């Protein structure tokens, strides 16, 4: 019999475990649910249950992700864990499960490894706001100075990728010992889990809700209402909009057009305000039907700008995932689906030493679109060719 759902009275936050394979991400996830279950704040989810992660689809890509939930005194957490390295890469690039904070798991026996670096780099590129380190398997290292060394290495690595490596919390423990500990919250083997949760509560900042960000709505459709003017429809991506507010139409050229949203409607009813997540129609003052089109965005003036050239981290689908069967090189020209825009672009540059990109690769490349689109760092998009998705990307740097 399933337990009733948690009552959501506490602020909610999305977190996840990241790090190198076999460093203990999944065991740590299990240990957290075990500890919280002792207070009735979670259902204990053992390792085996987390490890057989169900498949999800995001932007045409199949990803295995496990979601668990637990609470502390302060917050309600939704926690994601992925079984395979490729699943992490795909999740972070598609944004299938967003993270407001990440727990970087590093084994004391190994220190930072290649996937540790890759996950940290991606966390930086997709704007994960904060990171906490859990040094795992400390019971398997006899010399505490070795653990100190691992901690220094991890802090250096995080600083290199612009996280506050000197300041962020580093917890030491053994996830396996915690899972195997008796059901006593004061047991010494569970102390590290308590420390980790306390650090999450105090160090992870409250997420900025989408409604608190500047208004932005991708244009899905445009039509004219006789005698009233031009209406654009779409789903508000962030922020709040009220009638009478100034907005900009951005995209398709470097010129942006100012307008005033004179009316906001939902299901043919006028609204005093609409917010992130709402599907609405906005009546635009002084805009002809041919001055606005699908693929542009309506946004708070000055909050986002149009660009043609940018760097992006792209995961290229494998043949088995429905992607390309062959590699591509510089000069490849697929379609980029950026919000509602469907625009041709060219891969104008690849990293030094990379001649071709193989299906299954994850590569940072430079892209130039044929016309400017409203773009910002950390934004996700799909890469398509001949009607099928061949890749998923995230903008890592704006060039022009």
Curated annotation (Swiss-Prot):
It is found in: Cytoplasm. Residues 136-139 are annotated as: G4. One of its GO terms (molecular function) is GTPase activity. Residues 174-176 are annotated as: G5. Gene3D superfamilies: P-loop containing nucleotide triphosphate hydrolases (3.40.50.300), Translation factors (2.40.30.10). It catalyses: GTP + H2O = GDP + phosphate + H(+). Keywords: Cytoplasm, Elongation factor, GTP-binding, Hydrolase, Magnesium, Metal-binding, Nucleotide-binding, Protein biosynthesis. Residues 60-64 are annotated as: G2. One of its GO terms (cellular component) is cytosol. GTP binds at residues 19-26, 81-85, 136-139. Residues 10-208 form the tr-type G domain. GTP hydrolase that promotes the GTP-dependent binding of aminoacyl-tRNA to the A-site of ribosomes during protein biosynthesis. Monomer. Belongs to the TRAFAC class translation factor GTPase superfamily. Classic translation factor GTPase family. EF-Tu/EF-1A subfamily. This is Elongation factor Tu. It comes from Fervidobacterium nodosum (strain ATCC 35602 / DSM 5306 / Rt17-B1).
């Amino acid at each position: 019999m399933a337990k009733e759902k948690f009552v959501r009275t506490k602020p909610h936050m999305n977190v996840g475990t990241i790090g190198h394979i076999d460093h203990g991400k999944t065991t740590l996830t299990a240990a957290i649910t075990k500890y919280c279950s002792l207070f009735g704040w979670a259902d204990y989810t053992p390792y085996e249950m987390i490890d057989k992660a169900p498949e999800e689809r995001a932007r045409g890509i199949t990803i295995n992700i496990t979601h668990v939930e637990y609470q502390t005194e302060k917050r309600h957490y939704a926690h994601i864990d992925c079984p395979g390295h490729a699943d992490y890469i795909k999740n972070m690039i598609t944004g299938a499960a967003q993270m407001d904070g990440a727990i970087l798991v590093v084994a004391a026996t190994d220190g930072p490894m290649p996937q540790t670096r890759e996950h940290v780099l991606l966390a930086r590129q997709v704007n994960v706001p904060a990171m906490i380190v859990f040094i795992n398997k400390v019971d398997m290292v006899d010399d505490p100075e070795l653990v100190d060394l691992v901690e220094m290495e991890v802090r250096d690595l995080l600083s290199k990728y612009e996280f506050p490596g000197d300041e962020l919390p580093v917890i030491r423990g053994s996830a396996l010992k915690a899972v195997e500990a008796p059901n006593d919250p004061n047991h010494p083997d569970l102390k590290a889990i308590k420390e980790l949760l306390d650090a999450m509560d105090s160090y992870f900042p409250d997420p900025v809700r989408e409604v608190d960000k500047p208004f932005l709505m991708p244009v899905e459709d445009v039509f004219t209402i006789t005698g009233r003017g031009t209406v654009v429809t779409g789903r508000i991506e962030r922020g709040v909009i009220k009638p009478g507010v100034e907005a900009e139409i951005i995209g398709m050229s470097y010129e942006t057009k100012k307008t005033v949203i004179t009316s906001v409607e939902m299901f043919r009813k006028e609204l005093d305000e609409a917010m992130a997540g709402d599907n609405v129609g906005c009546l635009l003052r002084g805009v002809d039907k041919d001055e606005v089109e699908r693929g542009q965005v309506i946004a708070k003036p000055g909050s986002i700008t149009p660009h043609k050239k940018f760097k992006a981290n792209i995961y290229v689908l494998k043949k088995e995932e429905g992607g390309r069967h062959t590699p591509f090189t510089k000069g490849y020209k697929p379609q980029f689906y950026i919000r509602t825009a469907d625009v041709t672009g060219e891969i104008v540059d690849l990293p030094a030493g990379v001649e071709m990109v193989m299906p299954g690769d994850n590569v940072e490349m430079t892209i130039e679109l044929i016309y400017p689109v409203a773009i910002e760092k950390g934004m996700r998009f799909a890469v398509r060719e001949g009607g099928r998705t061949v890749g998923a990307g995230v903008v890592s740097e704006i060039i022009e």
